[in-house]
């Protein structure tokens, strides 16, 4: 039986971004565990054989102390069990590490003066750096840039559903703006099908309503312009590390105009290669 499970071991200097990296892996859909004692690694991996998770990220740091020297052998044993193992080592300049510790007020795991602690940690982690498959210098990286770098490392391993999840939501302003919305657009400038006797009881998912709305040039013009704006914005949000985006489309009651526009945008974004879900909050109210 072929084992498709992949284990990414994240390690590196304290303050270089291990915790943030694990959060990013979690956003990518990985099953993440931080600070699992190395003595339990092989038992944990054996346990994973019967779990559904295929992508796992494990955090390792200097707090493992003398046990760190066993990691190369542990990795070799895990590979023998047919797991795909990839080690990422995070580093940053001494000055940046000092700055980060100063900003966060965290104490270094090695109880010494900070500069001395960083120097000792570098020396102790050198064997791990030497076996790492990828080393990332986070000195000048924003969170979004770190995520972008990790994305490139994982590009061959990530599932489609670990990409940015886009939700297009229709709603009625009289029922309140959705709290989860990242972007809100008001389409009440479009003629309202509600005032057409034959359309009043229908919704924006019905063909007669769609035809009515699209009979007005401003509807098509809006769709084209807003879609182009979203195609511009979405990659920018992804670059900054955003994993979820909720686009809320509102009209008066949330039954006609917003539903049609939300449905049309969902189809267009999907055709453009984005992962999109659609939800009509107030369509039955």
Swiss-Prot record:
This is Nucleotide-binding protein Emin_0125. Displays ATPase and GTPase activities. Coiled coil: none annotated. Belongs to the RapZ-like family. GTP binds at residues 61-64. Keywords: ATP-binding, GTP-binding, Nucleotide-binding. ATP binds at residues 12-19. It comes from Elusimicrobium minutum (strain Pei191). GO terms for molecular function: ATP binding; GTP binding.
